C-alpha cells in the first residue's frame, strides 16, 4: 500500500475494500474539496477525521494534510485509490 494507510478491510469475497488512510502533504488530494477530486466511479468517501472530530463528508469538505479518511472502493479501483494517496518523491 502507498501513502500512510492505517487499515484495510476486505468486504465480501475481496470484491471491495474499506481503506483508512492519513492524508500526507504530498498526496494529490491534500488541499482539495471532495467534489474536485477525481475519484473513480466505484469509490465513496465514508468519513473524514479532522483534528480528532469525525465528520460526515460532503462535496465542499476540504481534505487537508493530517486528516484521516475512510474510503470505500471496489476492487477494480484500488490501484487508482493508491495513486491518490501516494506520497510524491518530494516527501523524501
State each model region's role.
Residues 19-85, 92:
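Cytosolic Rossmann-like ligand/nucleotide-binding regulatory domains
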Residues 1-26, 89-92:
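Flexible, Lys/Arg-rich cytosolic regulatory linkers and terminal tails that connect or flank
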